[in-house]
Swiss-Prot record:
Alphabetical list of InterPro entries matching this protein: RNA_methyltr_RlmE, RNA_MeTrfase_FtsJ_dom, rRNA-MeTfrase_E, SAM-dependent_MTases_sf
Gene expressing this chain: rlmE
Positions that bind S-adenosyl-L-methionine: G76, W78, D99, D115, D139
Protein name: Ribosomal RNA large subunit methyltransferase E
Top EC class of this enzyme: transferase
Record has Methyltransferase as a keyword: yes
GO terms for MF: rRNA (uridine-2'-O-)-methyltransferase activity
Keywords per UniProt: Cytoplasm, Methyltransferase, rRNA processing, S-adenosyl-L-methionine, Transferase
Amino acid sequence: MAKDTTGRLRVTVKSAGRLKLSSKLWLERQLNDPYVAQAKRDGLRSRAAYKLIEIDDKYHFLKPGIAVVDLGAAPGGWSQVAAKRVGAADGRGKVVAIDLLEMPEIVGVDFAQLDFLHAEAPAKLLSMIGGKVDVVLSDMAANTTGHRKTDQLRIVGLVEDAAAFACDVLKPGGTFVAKVFQSGADATLVTQLKRDFVTVKHVKPASSRKDSSERYVLAMGFRGVPTTHDADAPMATS
Ligand SMILES: C[S@@+](CC[C@H](N)C(=O)[O-])C[C@H]1O[C@@H](n2cnc3c(N)ncnc32)[C@H](O)[C@@H]1O
């Protein structure tokens, strides 16, 4: 690996000879990304952790003692941040997390490898949660097919399902944070969220790549509409 004139690490033709072009670009981006380096220094599993840190530093919804659900949690950056801020390690707060992929253990985080879109996922999640929660996070990103319309529908569909789940499990006053992509396709979602939450806004943390259409929808002050699931039992925070 060599450094360019700005001192940034570059993948040379020699070092990356056997990598595909997309892998080379990804690797170069990783090597030059200050958040990747910072995550290593801070012991965080992903650069994505800084997105949640930034959003919560501004809006303060992760409080000691609360219960959080983290959808699409692997490799675990958001779960690490949530666990620390709610005090999950010492049992004050609780974090329940799921992902399609495996995720190495995080102290205080109750994790299941699970497809959120699977018919049994809501019931499984509800049994893990054991009651209503204060915050639902979703950093899930649907796999893309390359067909723009299909991808947009899948992305929005995933967020809509996450929002519907949030409305089933949130306590009144609760918060929903979800990754969306700037496409205009989420207009219906925003309309629904405005009905169910006191404030709804889009946020783009500085750590979210500028060249990405990624942003987050932040819905706060859940109004407490009737649920379709029986999640009324008090929260267990063992
Ligand atoms: C951007 S990553 C999440 C990064 C994570 N917030 C962190 O800080 O480490 C998106 C994750 O969503 C997961 N995902 C996508 N669709 C999913 C689904 N239907 N059910 C569960 N997880 C899903 C992917 O497996 C992937 O790990």
